């Protein structure tokens, strides 16, 4: 297991929203000073980074981007949250999803797959190339508002482009309520049940889940699976099938980019981010 110096001093920082339970875990691990709103950031030095949670905090993110303040963005983890209660949360330095691949050890990944009951399905099975339909996963309101897109326009344009370049049927999967997306309603079940050939999405975590399950993906906006996804929908019949060794190294990196609340509360998450320059 990667050794982390738990006694190293964490520099001063800020955290928005003392009422948020996940932010509270990060605050406990970093001893961050709470502020109640992004509007209060102007009262603090730009040298102080700030922890922010969820795309609903887009004004805080935009404020940091405009002023050059570092921020730690916290949201749903990429993998392993198939159960009712989310276990893993991504923490991204100066971004919404991780984009700078890092070659890291495989220890966290092995812990996920070998030691966590019910996560054995995460092992990359190799590419599945004999599927039928295209699964189109639509964006929810939050990313649409954050990136300034019109959901229906994106959907119409995407469907039209796909239909120009393939005769495969298109199945649309809307995000819906969380309880509808876990257990039997998980995307993994649908990939199998509908024998999906490829997944198309805006920047949903569905791309990450599909790639790890051996189904290629196409994306429109930055996400952690970028390096393994095709962006050009005119190539819908010829998806990107990266080497297995690269997919596995990517999975090791994904495991280093998400954390439990306990890892946040002990400062382990922060120290891993800084040690491996994860962003």
Labelled PLM ranges:
Residues 37-43, 163-218, 222-224:
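Donor nucleotide-activated moiety binding/catalytic core segment of transferases
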Residues 6, 74-78, 131-143, 173-176, ...:
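Short loop/turn segments at strand-loop or loop-helix junctions that form parts
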Residues 34, 70-72, 78, 170, ...:
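Hydrophobic beta-strand scaffold residues
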Residues 57-110, 204-205, 212:
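A basic- and aromatic-enriched beta-loop-alpha substructure that forms the phosphate/nucleotide-
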Residues 1-49, 54, 142-143, 272-279:
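N-terminal pre-catalytic "stem/leader" segment of glycosyltransferase-like enzymes
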Residues 83-131, 227-279:
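Leloir-type glycosyltransferase catalytic cores
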Residues 37-66, 70-74, 196-203:
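Short, well-ordered secondary-structure micro-motifs within conserved domains or adaptor modules
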Residues 12-16, 137-138, 142, 150-189:
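Catalytic donor nucleotide-activated moiety binding site of glycosyltransferases and closely related
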